[in-house]
Amino acid sequence: GTVFALLGPNGAGKTTVVRILSTLIRADAGEARVAGHDVRAGADRVRAEIGVTGQFSAVDDLLTGAENMMLMAGLRHLGREAGAARVRELLERFDLAQAAGRLPSTYSGGMRRRLDLAMTLVGSPSVIFLDEPTTGLDPRSRRTMWDSIRALVASGVTIFLTTQYLDEADELADQIAVLDHGRIVAQGSADQLKQRIPGGHLQLEFATVQALELASAMLDGAAREDGKLILRVPNDGSVASLRRLLAELDEGSVEVERLSTHTPDLDDVFFAVTGRPSTEAAAAA
């Protein structure tokens, strides 16, 4: 019932990790377990527990949506009646019932991804590998996919997510690891990773020059913003440190007109640990 996100630059090895853990290829060395089973010695048991959906859809365009689903039910040995019931349930859950009789070539990109994910769920896996599941989707389709992932997590499914979208990891992941040149270079929750990076600060805006000067004299490391009644004060953004700062200003009878916080985001983390901007940040630049 959690989401583990693997981030990394192109070529870092994210898809290779997914292929090893899903038993599609064998590792050169080392050990790994999925759902308690060794991926080398217990590959069949691993496959029985997992589902995999990648950035390139496994949907067959020569079959209708429902036929694609029934094909997966057959591969999972569900039996005709049980398989049909499971297919109906998933088509309804992913809002595909009305399109079930159509060929996937007539689907939108978001619909194809939902069909691909629904096919993965036919066998009720306990662990699902999502390899860049929202690449190429428009913002609305991405949000719809996020909602589907949250629903899976709420039902107890564990998600292993690779993504090039840092906001996606920030939004969905309980734990994040950053992979670079085949090695984990950072790991933790989004908040833990952000706190490792210096640069967090509070921005304090004052109504008068007198208040600005009093605060500047009181607060260690405070820096003025040229031409404005604004101070920037180093701060980790925690509630405790914010309370201490406000108490100090209150004791000095200094009134703050406006306050805002800035903490490093995952782009800052990514750049700090890999030496490169994320794919998303590079595209924006």
Each language-model region and where it sits:
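Conserved ABC ATPase "signature" region
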Residues: 70, 74, 81-99
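Catalytic Walker B motif of ABC-type/P-loop ATPase nucleotide-binding domains
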Residues: 128-131
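Conserved ABC transporter NBD signature motif
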Residues: 30-41, 46
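Walker A (P-loop) phosphate-binding loop of ABC-type ATPase nucleotide-binding domains
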Residues: 9-13
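Conserved catalytic motifs of ABC-family nucleotide-binding domains
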Residues: 124
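ABC transporter nucleotide-binding domain
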Residues: 146-235
